[in-house]
Design a protein with these regions (language model features):
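Mixed-charge (Asp/Glu-Lys/Arg
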Residues: 1-39, 45-126
Length: 126
């Protein structure tokens, strides 16, 4: 009898969420993870001002973790989103950013999704 499996992709996903949370926490923001949500938003970032007051200003975050998300096009990367996610992000009531993390290299890139979702193209240039 075999034991339950924990796929490597689950480890890679968790590494990405934890890495992004650490970056924003170190910057003084509040990172709120949405547990077990795969609808296109992995968490929220709330701004904290210089007086250490929360501001109620939020960003939604979509996190992608893994080498496979780095489609190198020379001077930039392209992330190919499916049409349903692009539509979802466009309709989202607050700004959405895409965070792509490569745990093998430690490279992390951020891009506003709102500015790329106007034409419903599935390409997001990073």
């Amino acid at each position: 009898m075999s034991l339950p499996k924990y796929p490597k992709t689950s480890t890679t996903e968790r590494l990405g969420v934890l890495h992004i949370a650490a970056i924003f926490t170190e910057m003084g923001f509040i990172f709120r993870e949405i547990p077990n949500s795969d609808t296109g938003i992995d968490g929220y970032i709330e701004e904290v001002n210089d007086n250490h007051e929360t501001t109620a200003r939020l960003l939604a975050v979509q996190i992608k973790s893994g080498k496979s998300y780095f489609n190198d096009q020379g001077e930039y990367f392209v992330y190919y989103a499916d049409e349903s996610h692009i539509k979802y992000w466009k309709l989202y009531p607050i700004p959405v950013i895409l965070c792509i993390y490569n745990p093998e290299t430690g490279y992390t890139y951020f891009q506003s999704i709102k500015c790329h979702s106007q034409d419903f193209s599935n390409k997001i240039y990073i």
